[in-house]
Design a protein with these regions (language model features):
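Active-site metal-binding motif and surrounding structural segment of the metallo-beta-lactamase
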Residues: 124, 135-182
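Active-site neighborhood of phospho(di)ester-bond hydrolases with catalytic His/Asp-centered motifs
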Residues: 129-131, 153-161, 181-184, 243-247, ...
Length: 478
């Protein structure tokens, strides 16, 4: 006999329980394909396929028996208080932070975790702006249910379909069956791709610039394609002068109680703002410029992004950064020296160059070891500064892999308008400078003609060459 708990998950990806599957069989499902169509079980990673097959056989042969585990009643006084926060009149934060996260998008280190923001408007009609990542699903749903109470959820505005914001859409629409989703045509197509055609039917496509009255509040919807996916839009609440900005103006890091940007050490957060922008959105400067142009026509008192703190003061600070970043304009005239060194000889030459640059008046020179630093940090520093020195050993007749990877990252994230100097090392047949120059072709960066070639180590006789390279860098800063 196959004993099962109807409330237990059989497919965690699609959040399908044994009870859901048993119900699907009662309604005529006969094959695994039928189960997939009706419940989405097995449609994602496939690890549940064997369980589904065994349970399906047990149901069809009459050998399945439901065994409901008794649950102790929990009084409301024992339930942990939700983490919703008021943003302004009628608008609440209902998101949450995942402090256990160590990588964002499986690649970017987030040592301080990650926040996944969602907002609820309580007007005559209720509006939820985006959902959250699966990692914070339970806290988000508690926040939402507590704030709504007996009220229904009327609308779900979907700004962006990336799963860190869209993973719980199906759950929200299941819990509030009369809720209507609002999104761009591109987002509706993705709804069908992620969750199936039936759920996509719950979405109303919205045109660019269309407005909606929810009671006191007037919402207008504005397309923001490629910031940083094609289906993205933002929402402007004319009544509270709030911009719900999707991924724009977001950052890495969990929220540690301080919900607003004016409550945190901004210099600490700005480094992560920059790293977030340059690595997530950096390639799409043109689309960001278009969004900034739209935003300039709005009277904005606060910006509510999908990651990081809410901006309600000094909005000019982050807007100015976005203008620079999206036009690939350096924030400061300075130098980052990114090097790939195996035994330390190339690193020593870079340290010597850094000292010479400092003596000549260049402030805040940054040395970064590509074998130790994650590329996202180096990309952020390269966006920040006007000049970049790339120094690499020759390896297997080409570039050291970490340097090659970094230059590909530069190209991938669209870094341009920088002045680049090259240094190479090789005990025989050094070719690293030529390989770097070839990779940089077409990147809209200016490569200085002066290059340094080391033969195993930096010689005293080459210090003059470093002086000349430093002078060339200084001259190009004017």
């Amino acid at each position: 006999m196959f004993e099962y708990d109807p409330k237990k998950s059989i497919c965690t990806c699609a959040r399908v329980t044994y009870g859901d599957m048993a119900e699907a069989v009662e309604k005529g499902a006969r094959t695994v394909a039928d189960i997939r169509e009706k419940t989405r079980a097995t449609a994602f990673c496939g690890s549940c396929t064997e369980r589904v097959e065994k349970f399906l056989t047990a149901l069809q042969t009459g050998e399945a028996k439901a065994v409901v585990q008794a649950e102790e009643p929990v009084s409301e006084s024992e339930i942990v208080a939700p983490g919703f926060r008021q943003v302004c009149e009628d608008i609440y934060y209902v998101g949450a932070s995942d402090r256990a996260a160590d990588r964002f998008e499986k690649q970017y280190p987030v040592p301080r975790g990650m926040s996944f923001n969602s907002y609820l408007l309580l007007d005559r009609q209720t509006v939820l702006f985006d959902t959250v990542d699966q990692s914070v699903r339970e806290v988000f749903l508690r926040n939402l249910e507590t704030l709504l109470g007996e009220r229904r959820l009327d609308f779900l505005v979907i700004h962006h379909m990336e799963p860190d914001h869209a993973a719980t859409i199906a759950e929200v629409l299941r819990r509030w069956p009369k809720c209507q989703a609002i999104c761009t045509p591109g987002a509706k197509k993705m709804l069908g791709q992620f969750f199936g055609p039936q759920l996509a039917k719950r979405a109303q496509e919205i045109r660019d610039g269309v407005s909606m009255l929810t009671g006191k509040h007037v919402l207008s919807f504005h397309n923001a394609p490629m910031v940083h996916w094609p289906e993205v839009m933002v929402t402007y609440d004319r009544t509270s002068e709030t911009l719900f900005s999707a991924d724009a103006f977001g950052t890495f890091g969990a929220l540690d109680g301080n919900l607003f940007a004016d409550q945190v050490n901004l210099s600490d957060w700005m480094d992560e703002d920059r790293r977030y922008y340059t690595n997530i959105v950096g390639k799409y400067g043109g689309p960001v410029q278009q969004l900034l142009q739209k935003a300039s026509q709005m009277s904005i008192r606060r910006i509510c992004p999908l990651h990081g703190p809410i901006w309600r003061q000094d909005l000019g600070v982050i807007l100015d950064k976005y203008r620079k970043w999206s036009t690939y304009t350096p924030e400061e005239k300075s130098v980052v020296i990114a090097y790939a060194s195996i035994y330390g000889n190339t690193e020593l030459a870079c340290q010597a160059l850094a000292g010479i640059l400092s003596d000549k008046g260049v402030r805040d020179v940054k040395l970064m070891d590509l074998s130790r630093e994650h590329p996202s940090y180096v990309i952020a520093e390269a966006f920040r500064r006007s000049h970049l020195v790339l120094a690499s050993v020759t390896y297997n007749g080409g570039l050291f892999p970490d340097m090659e990877h970094f230059i590909h990252q530069m190209k991938h994230h669209g870094l341009k308008n920088r002045t680049v100097a090259l240094m190479e090392n090789g005990s025989w047949a050094p070719v690293a400078a030529r390989k770097m120059d070839e990779l940089l072709t077409g990147t809209e960066n200016h490569v200085l003609g002066k290059k340094i070639t080391l033969l195993s180590t930096l010689k005293r006789s080459q210090l003059q060459e470093l002086e000349e390279l430093a002078d060339a860098i200084l001259s190009s800063m004017k």
